[in-house]
């Protein structure tokens, strides 16, 4: 049992004091050296390492005087064991601490009588002598400049750099400057926000126009005369004003109609009802599913679901990344066509009052791919503002003569609207996707990472039945790249695999009306 207690104490001391990075006993050891621990140390002292013995002996100096008096016998026995040790440093420390438990003082008269101390001091003197002797500067060095000091004392040895300060990177400095500037800007904005701004009270500062009637205010409300005192006049002379703006805002929606205008309102409601019925027939879905499709339909498929969303395709410019010319929407408002039979011989009053910049919309600097189109649509030349009169027709008197070279020849422009006018009505009635086609298109576009919006519009129009080829110079078969990804395919000999670049292509045949999807495989080495 005693041997087990000794081994436990020795292991505990080694864990506490055996660290080589700390060569001095810490003051916290005083709380660990109790009477029971000192008694166990006395029994296992001979089995401890030299470093632990030294730290233990030096740790007794941190004990309070009252504790030293209580454990005087055990401490004297430990110091006696240390004085018989083979290590010279343990032996020297034991000689120094020989008088400490009795008197509380150290024995420092060892140099002359102890040969062990003489040997240790000799070794220390040799090691200190190996170091470079310190060069003492003259007293007048603080009054001399660098050149005079070098002349007097010789070249000075540069100081040894024991460590280097870690400077902050330049990005941290820039970040701090930006934060400071943003803080100053925010404070300036707060200060400027506190300044009173008259735009909030513009209803009080603006002059009232009494020449035109105010909309939505009942006739019974008292109006102020033009000669009434201002808003800031005394309250006794003021005409009563309606109490709050919210009441006026609610009353603005009220509009007084004449009896003769009731027929027009009824006709408008009837037209709205008929339009809703037509939309419901085209989509062929219940009311709940119709609202989901209306919200989820992208703008490139607007013409295939509802005729009210045609403007979104005309207003969206074609993306320049396409490898061919995307077609304009198959469904075009009828006002974009000009049959020759309906062309007026002279400009009407509505055209005469038109601003002069509208006829100059087809400028001579249009891209060449837009010039190659047959003049069927006006929306292809001016997608932002579809005009009721096509500037490509030579019969329109408002077209300037400078635009004539950029358009097609006059006979083609006159004949094309006559031949295409009946064809225009056909896609307007028949262009609609079935439920299966809509799901197939959604599934196809879900993984497509190379197709653009005009290409999606062209694919949906072809699936719905449009047979107008926008790129006739490429033939009846047009291919559109849907997606591009890589696949690891096994080699022909069955050993290993090779990485191939896979292109998913959508092919449309305008001659037969059939479409297919297939994959093209290319080795990665051929791809730049």
Swiss-Prot record:
Please list the residue ranges that the record marks as compositionally biased, kind Low complexity: 320-341
Q: What is its main location?
A: nucleus
Span list, region RNAPII-binding: 189-248
Give the InterPro entries listed for this entry: HDAG_dom, NELF-A_domain, NELF-A_N
Q: Which UniProt keywords apply?
A: Nucleus, Phosphoprotein, Repressor, Transcription, Transcription regulation
Q: Where is this region: Disordered?
A: 215-245, 320-409
How it assembles, according to the record, is: The NELF complex is composed of NELFA, NELFB, NELFCD (isoform NELF-C or isoform NELF-D) and NELFE; NELFA and NELFCD form a stable subcomplex that binds to the N-terminus of NELFB. In vitro, the NELFA:NELFCD subcomplex binds to ssDNA and ssRNA in a sequence- and structure-dependent manner. Interacts with the RNA polymerase II complex when it is not phosphorylated by P-TEFb.
* Family statement: Belongs to the NELF-A family.
| Comment field on protein domains | The HDAg-like domain is essential for transcriptional repression, and mediates the interaction with the RNA polymerase II complex.
Name of the molecule in the record: Negative elongation factor A
Species this chain originates from: Homo sapiens
């Amino acid at each position: 049992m005693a041997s087990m207690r000794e081994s436990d104490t020795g292991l505990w001391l080694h864990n506490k004091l055996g660290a080589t990075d700390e060569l001095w006993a810490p003051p916290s050891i005083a709380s660990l050296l109790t009477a029971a621990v000192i008694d166990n140390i006395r029994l296992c002292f001979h089995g401890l390492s030299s470093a632990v013995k030294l730290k233990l002996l030096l740790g007794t100096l941190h004990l309070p005087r009252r504790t030293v008096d209580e454990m005087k016998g055990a401490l004297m026995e430990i110091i006696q064991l240390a004085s018989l040790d083979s290590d010279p440093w343990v032996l020297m420390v034991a000689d120094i601490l020989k008088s400490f438990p009795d008197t509380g003082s150290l024995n420092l008269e060892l140099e002359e009588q102890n040969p062990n101390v003489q040997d240790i001091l000799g070794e220390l003197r040799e090691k200190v002598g190996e170091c470079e002797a310190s060069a003492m500067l003259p007293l007048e060095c603080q009054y001399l400049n660098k050149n005079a000091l070098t002349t007097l004392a010789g070249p000075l040895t540069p100081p040894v750099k024991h460590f280097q300060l870690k400077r902050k990177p330049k990005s941290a400095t820039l970040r701090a400057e930006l934060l400071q500037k943003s803080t100053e800007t925010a404070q300036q904005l707060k200060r400027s926000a506190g300044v009173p701004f008259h735009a909030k009270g513009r209803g009080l500062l603006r002059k009232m126009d009494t020449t035109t009637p105010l909309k939505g205010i009942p006739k019974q409300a008292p109006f102020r005369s033009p000669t009434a005192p201002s808003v800031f006049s005394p309250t006794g002379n003021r005409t009563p004003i309606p109490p709050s703006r919210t009441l006026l805002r609610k009353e603005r929606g009220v509009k007084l109609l004449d009896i003769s205008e009731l027929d027009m309102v009824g006709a408008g409601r009837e037209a709205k009802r008929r339009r809703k019925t037509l939309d419901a027939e085209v989509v062929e879905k219940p009311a709940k599913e119709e609202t989901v499709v209306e919200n989820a339909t992208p703008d490139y498929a607007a013409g295939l679901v509802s005729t009210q969303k045609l403007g979104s395709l005309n207003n969206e410019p074609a993306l320049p990344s396409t490898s061919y010319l995307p077609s304009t929407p198959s469904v075009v408002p009828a006002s974009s066509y000009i049959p020759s039979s309906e062309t007026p011989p002279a400009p009407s009053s509505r055209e005469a009052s038109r601003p002069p910049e509208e006829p100059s919309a087809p400028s001579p600097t249009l891209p060449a791919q837009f010039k190659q189109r047959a003049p069927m649509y006006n929306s292809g030349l001016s997608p932002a503002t579809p005009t009721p009169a096509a500037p490509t027709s030579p019969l329109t008197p408002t077209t300037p003569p400078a635009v004539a070279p950029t358009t097609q020849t006059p006979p083609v422009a006159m004949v094309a609207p006559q031949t295409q006018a009946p064809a225009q009505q056909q896609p307007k009635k028949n262009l609609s996707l079935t439920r299966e086609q809509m799901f197939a298109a959604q599934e196809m576009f879900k993984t497509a990472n190379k197709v653009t919006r005009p290409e999606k519009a062209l694919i949906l129009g072809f699936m719905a039945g449009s047979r107008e080829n926008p790129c006739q110079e490429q033939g009846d078969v047009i291919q559109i790249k849907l997606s591009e990804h890589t696949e690891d395919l096994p080699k022909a000999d069955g050993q290993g695999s090779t990485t191939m670049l896979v292109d998913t292509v959508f092919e449309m045949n305008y001659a037969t009306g059939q479409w297919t999807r297939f994959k093209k495989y290319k080795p990665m080495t051929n791809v730049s």
